[in-house]
UniProtKB/Swiss-Prot annotation:
NCBIfam families: rpsB_bact (TIGR01011). HAMAP family: Ribosomal_uS2_B. The keyword Ribonucleoprotein applies. GO terms for cellular component: cytosolic small ribosomal subunit. GO terms for biological process: translation. This is Small ribosomal subunit protein uS2. One of its GO terms (molecular function) is structural constituent of ribosome. The gene is rpsB. Belongs to the universal ribosomal protein uS2 family. Gene3D superfamilies: Glucose-6-phosphate isomerase like protein, domain 1, Helix hairpin bin. It comes from Dinoroseobacter shibae (strain DSM 16493 / NCIMB 14021 / DFL 12). It comes from the Bacteria.
């Protein structure tokens, strides 16, 4: 496997170059704007390409060192691609609503994850010994907790890097990452500020095709990092993108340590 290839044509076809209306711009994005067309700012894709490549390299290197990547995108059109991309590369995601303190107050979040797991165990046991009212209450709690925390329930600690779609909407996530010194990779549109983002990807953060492209590339970069991390252990990662991530990791965990 290798770092995913992409080109300007793909970015154009996905609409990555379309920014927002010129009157809604953030002057901090001026260096990345090529011009405007019919009152819409157009991104300079000759800058987006190398910056996206640097961002993908950061994701790859993080995973190659055994690090965890958290995908963050809670806007409607980002929810599904964010979750699918993270699951595809055995990473983690928040796609429902950012809970304040997810990173800065991990202990409390971890307790909530523990509650979710205990409810799941009770459900598997058929809610034995519980009244109908108690069962309904636990099912309601499970639904809420799963929506909020399902994507990070196995994360086991704060991530080593976060990938964000829409820095304006996910400003809390970025602020928490900045506070903890966690690197931020983010798509930044013309109406947003790149402040607080370590790896800026200048591009459209609204178009479904653009979001799908970013998520696909980041997932593939993470898979390449995983290949680098586990390849030396002799694990066959050829089937990773066909859904064999968990199986490969299980094989690695079950393999006896070399003396």
């Amino acid at each position: 496997m290798a770092l995913p290839d992409f080109n300007i044509r793909q970015l154009l076809e996905a609409g990555v170059h379309f920014g927002h209306q010129t009157q809604r711009w953030n002057p901090r994005m001026a260096p990345y704007i090529y011009g405007d067309r019919n009152g819409i700012h157009i991104m300079d894709l000759t800058q987006t390409v190398p910056m996206l490549d640097q961002a993908l390299q950061a994701v790859r290197d993080t995973v190659a060192k055994g690090g965890r990547v958290l995908f963050v995108g809670t806007k409607r059109q980002a929810q599904k691609p964010i979750a699918e991309a993270a699951e595809r590369c055995a990473q983690y995601y928040m796609n429902h609503r950012w809970l304040g303190g997810t990173l800065t107050n991990w202990k409390t979040v971890s307790n909530s994850i523990g509650r979710l797991k205990s409810i799941d165990e009770a459900m598997e046991g058929g809610f034995e010994g519980l009244t109908k009212k108690e069962r309904l209450g636990m099912e309601r709690d499970q639904g809420k907790l799963q929506a909020s925390l399902g994507g990070i329930r196995e994360m086991g600690g704060v991530p080593d890097l976060i990938f964000v779609i829409d820095v304006k909407k996910e400003d809390l996530a970025i602020a928490e990452a900045n506070k903890l010194g966690i690197p931020v990779v983010a798509v930044v549109d013309t109406n947003c500020s790149p402040d607080g983002v370590d790896y800026v990807i200048p591009g459209n953060d609204d178009a479904a095709r653009a979001i799908a492209l970013y998520c696909d590339l980041v997932a593939r970069a993470a898979l390449d990092g995983m290949s680098a991390q586990l390849g030396a252990a002799g694990v066959d990662l050829g089937a990773l993108e066909e859904g064999g991530v968990e199986e490969a990791l299980a094989e690695e965990a079950a393999a006896p340590a070399e003396s």
